[in-house]
């Protein structure tokens, strides 16, 4: 982005002609194209697989959450005045919907939570009582008005993150999955531990402890395992070398 902005804006400051601006635009579009290609290459599956452990470590997520909390608080302190909110005379610049003083009118959708909390706190809904309470306890009412907004802002930013950036999705698979994978990938290693008796083996193979366990061992192995006995040459035990 910085490269695009520089390529597009820097020569236009010095040369005001249309030709230079068009050439700058071509430069900017080409830079954007190449940067998009580089980004696509950077976010390839191999790159993400390599650096996922670094990016999604617990320290990274902790610092990311801390940054989000601080930015949310900064945004709230900019948007909401420290004293009294909309009730104070030196309130924020942006216009807030005021509370309605009539009995029948409903509060607006933008200030529904704050106006509801204010109306529930005051039992008498007459216009004089509403105005007097808002004038007298402006500080407390402002606090009540601002706290739901703060909670909403924090929840809006923070709540979807644990579902997306959990470490559990990048964990090493469980022992059962690992065993299943290795049993299929390296069948001769699995065959060294559980093998059929000598009668069903090809002649000239090396003798092992599993050869002398009898036929019941072979039937048990056949029923329990999903992998047939491998036809690959078996690895010899170290005592037979």
From Swiss-Prot:
Q: Where is this motif: Mitochondrial targeting signal?
A: 175-184
Q: What InterPro entries does the entry give?
A: P30II
Q: Where is the composition biased (Low complexity)?
A: 79-100, 107-136
Show the GO cellular component annotation of the record. host cell mitochondrial inner membrane; host cell nucleolus; membrane
For this protein, the record's Pfam families field holds: Deltaretro_Tax
Q: Which organism is it from?
A: Human T-cell leukemia virus 1 (strain Japan ATK-1 subtype A) (HTLV-1)
- Sorted alphabetically, which keywords does the UniProt record give? Apoptosis, Host membrane, Host mitochondrion, Host mitochondrion inner membrane, Host nucleus, Membrane, Repressor
- What is the recorded function of this protein according to its Swiss-Prot or TrEMBL entry? p30II is a multifunctional regulator that sequesters EP300/CREBBP and down-regulates CREB-responsive element (CRE) and Tax-responsive element (TRE) mediated transcription. Specifically binds and represses tax/rex mRNA nuclear export. Since Tax and Rex are positive regulators of viral gene expression, their inhibition by p30II reduces virion production, and allows the virus to escape the host immune surveillance and persist latently in an immune-competent host.
Family (UniProt): Belongs to the HTLV-1 accessory protein p30II family.
- In this chain, the stretch annotated as Disordered covers 79-151
**Top-down, what is the taxonomic lineage of the species of origin?**
Viruses, Riboviria, Pararnavirae, Artverviricota, Revtraviricetes
Result after altering residue 140 to G: In strain: Isolate LAF
> What additional remark is attached to this entry?
HTLV-1 lineages are divided in four clades, A (Cosmopolitan), B (Central African group), C (Melanesian group) and D (New Central African group).
* Assembly: p30II binds to the KIX domains of CREBBP and EP300.
Q: What positions carry the motif Nuclear localization signal 1?
A: 73-78
Specify the effect of residue 54 to I: In strain: Isolate LAF
State what protein this is by name. Answer: Accessory protein p30II
Motif (Nuclear localization signal 2) positions are 91-98
